[in-house]
UniProtKB/Swiss-Prot annotation:
Membrane topology: Single-pass membrane protein
Similarity remark: Belongs to the cornifelin family.
Organism from which the protein derives: Zea mays
Membrane-crossing residue ranges in chain numbering: 67-84
Gene field: CNR3
Name of the featured protein: Cell number regulator 3
Amino acid sequence: MYPATTPYETASGVGVAPVAGLFPVAGEAREWSSRLLDCFDDFDICCMTFWCPCITFGRTAEIVDHGMTSCGTSAALFALIQWLSGSQCTWAFSCTYRTRLRAQHGLPEAPCADFLVHLCCLHCALCQEYRELKARGYEPVLGWEFNAQRAAAGVAMCPPASQGMGR
């Protein structure tokens, strides 16, 4: 009666069916692929996050949001909150994405509550979340659309919506 998989809606409005391995499977219990303090495991991301945490956050947020908000929008909002609060309130915004990432991939709330991780170790948390997406097959630097298209290779996509009458 209902399809076995629910397509993810992309920013362009094209539905993409989840593909095993890339998109999460509900109910699977998993562990984080790296620890919170393993920042130097990916030195490029470590440096990017140290100098421009808004970019790391924006890339992660675009994937977690399934492309509903762009990297640029999320990064700009993060930077604005950081600037207005003097870097004191970004954790309150960014920890919500850690919670969503954990829910999507069945990850434990470890090593402590999401808000504490972001309050005490914001840069380490952003690096861990980015590394987690990479470990699960995403390429955050390329954005949601690319990742969704790559996952849909060989998978039937929904036909485009009717454009109506036109010349």
